[in-house]
Amino acid sequence: MEPDTTRRSACDRCRGQKLRCVRLPGPAREDSPRSARSVNQPCERCKRAKVVCYTTKPVSRRLPQSYTRRRSTAYADDVMHSEVDLDEGMIGSNRLRDEPTIKRTPPAIADRLAHDPFPTELWSGLDISHASLDSSAVLSHVPDPGNMVESVAAQRANSNTLPSHQHGWPEDPHGALNYFEERAHDLPDVMSVSSPTDVRLGLDTVDRRPAAATSRTNQAIHSDTVNMHSQAPGSGETSERGLYSRASNTVADAAQLCTTQLSELNMRLMKDIESTTSFRQGMSAASDPNYPASGLGETSPSSSMVKFTNTMLANCQSFLDILQRLRSPTVELRGSSNSECSYGDLEYSSNEYSSSRSQSRNHSTSASSRSKDGRISAGGGLQSVLNSDTIGLSPSLDPIKADSSALDFSAFLSILSCYTHILRAYDALFTEILEMLMESSCIQLDLKIHNLVPEVSLGGFRLSGHGDLQIKCLLHMSFIILEKIESMLGVNAPEKDPYGSNGGLLNNSQLRGLLEALYHQKEFDYIRADGTRAARVKKTMKSIQRILDSI
């Protein structure tokens, strides 16, 4: 068999054009064992065209017998140091094929042109001077392998590319091997190429890694995949328990904030109630016929009533906002029979938004539950959103963990205290208004209460100066406010609510008795002066309404 360097007789130019190449063979050069071109005389066609005539050595498809596995840091525990020895022949014949795969000019050409890209025998027959065939100028488009690897690594590391003479590794083959061996773990990460243990054979890839290392790698990848899927949301029971945890933390934070706001509101209400004696004395003085009408201005006794009315309405607004936030978690997910959650099944449990109060329920939210730390959860309040029966999720989840988000007993007492102070404020205000109506005429009423509810207008009509209209507006608005507060608290809820969806925050077995003893109204026909405060306030409001209708 002829040598590898001469078994392909046609030059690359003639072979690419599928033409017959006619030339005389010449002696091979002994000083260039790694040359990619056989040293022959130029063929007739290349000589006439005045181009370089060369023949590329075909790539061998056989692995050399001296091939040994190169050690990689990923498999350092499985490959011994004794297996790292590479002979000089292996470095010369398979060096470029063991390097990471990079898109470039065929490596055999670039590597074997490093010594002498234009031998004398190739250009001696051409009318081209040797100076014009400077390798650095003519082959500037052919990248050097060392510069190529370094430039790619430098671009990935945001550093400047070094010239070929500043690559940093020794010129000795064994020294260069040790240099790359110490930095082998940087090549796959920086250049994003396959492992050096993969040998490229044409279009096929042979994995030379040990079987044990391959199995351990597959197990590690499988475990990472399992961990990733286990942490992904929406994966069965884990995601459902995560939903409970996130909902429980959110509701607990909201409950703590509402408890703090209730305490602050309670202190403000107590302070405002103490100021009722001042405006009562002022209104008593204003009801005196000897009191001059000219004194009814900013310094008149009615100004204290106006200030008290504005403060009371602002406190009612704050109290309603807090109650609304406490009731907002009672959005129930009415799931289908297979426990699937649907947006079309959302139903709000508050009185003003509920559209199906008469629908039957399979559970009672009015029944309260006590958590491990002794806190009470209000029926229909924060607890109902976290019941496994209420939320359309898997019934296998444990609803006991939801007790941590329930309000404590001090929060319920703050709610009762705020409601008590609001009733006292309304009682004091409407009692004074009723006394003025019974003692004064409509004209005197306009003089005494000329701006009870300031900055109120209906379209283009302003209520300033119309005392009777302002009182009617205040009556209707106050009545609606009290009804809304009582609805949220559960004051007027039935004693035996089989479903409990509209029971309110305080309508449960622990607080029901206290609520009834303090504020539960009786029928108005049986109420006298010694009736409860809530019933007395509403009775006073109805009396004022009858007087205003008769004027």
Swiss-Prot record:
Q: Where is the composition biased (Low complexity)?
A: 351-369
> What does this protein do, in the record's words?
C6 finger transcription factor that positively regulates the cluster that mediates the biosynthesis of imizoquins A to D, tripeptide-derived alkaloids that serve a protective role against oxidative stress that are essential for normal germination.
| UniProt-listed CDD domains | GAL4 (cd00067)
Q: What is this protein called?
A: C6 finger transcription factor imqK
One Gene Ontology term of the biological-process aspect is: positive regulation of metabolic process
Which Gene3D superfamilies does the record match to this protein? Zn(2)-C6 fungal-type DNA-binding domain (4.10.240.10)
DNA-binding region extent:
11-53
GO CC annotation: nucleus
List keywords of the entry alphabetically.
Answer: DNA-binding, Metal-binding, Nucleus, Transcription, Transcription regulation, Zinc
Broad class of where this protein is predominantly found: nucleus
Phenotype caused by lack of the gene: Impairs the production of imizoquins and leads to delayed germination.
Region of interest called Disordered, as start-end residue ranges on this chain: 280-302, 351-378
List GO molecular-function terms, semicolon-separated: DNA binding; DNA-binding transcription factor activity, RNA polymerase II-specific; zinc ion binding
Under what conditions is it induced? Expression is down-regulated by ralstonins, lipopeptides produced by the plant pathogenic bacteria Ralstonia solanacearum.
InterPro entries annotated for this entry? Zn2-C6_fun-type_DNA-bd_sf (IPR036864), Zn2Cys6_DnaBD (IPR001138)
Q: Where in the cell is it found?
A: Nucleus
- Source domain of life: Eukaryota
